[in-house]
Amino acid sequence: LTELMKCQKMQQQEVSVQDTDAVIEAVLKSMADFEGLPHRLQYVGTYRGVRYYDDSISTIPEAAINAAMSIPDAKTVLIGGMDRGINYDLLVTFIRKHKEFQFICAYASGKRIFGEVGDCENCVYAEDLEQAVEAAVQMTEPGGACILSPAAASYGYFKNFEERGETFQKYVHAFAQ
């Protein structure tokens, strides 16, 4: 009877291990197939060796900083939009400290941020998103990544963050190819 119980226990453990392997395979497949939400660090494509990401939903400085730090080999960050009068000190400090990134500022909040860090060689100003993407295509070296992460609202320039993100993607496809 003891041998029979041992045999049953071993069979149960084998089934358990097989079930675990199946679960792990299913999880890995789900992770590989997972597509994030649109405009949340959404991968746009790779052109001339540069990866482009759309984080248009980013409307605060912390989101732009997190985007820059979370994308491997991020080199260029496009920031700016409607100036709501929020405090950009955290982002200004980040720009000053992190010379490994190029920042392209646009629109009203970008103009204000650029005014605070204009003496930094890693920060330039562009009038609008079209100019910002053109500059990013020229500035971002192959092997690097470019992120639209505005740290500002889209209103006054776009209907919403979705339209801003779609416009960014359109410019990337047009200029980067």
Task: Locate each region found by the language model.
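Short beta-strands and strand-loop turn motifs
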Residues: 1, 147-151
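Residue-level preference for the first positions of well-ordered beta-strands
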Residues: 74-76, 143-147
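Short glycine-rich anion-binding loops that position phosphate/pyrophosphate groups of nucleotides
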Residues: 82-84, 109, 151-155
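C-terminal helical cap/extension that packs against the catalytic core
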Residues: 89-144
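Glycine/aspartate-rich loop-and-adjacent alpha/beta segment that forms the canonical ThDP
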Residues: 151-177
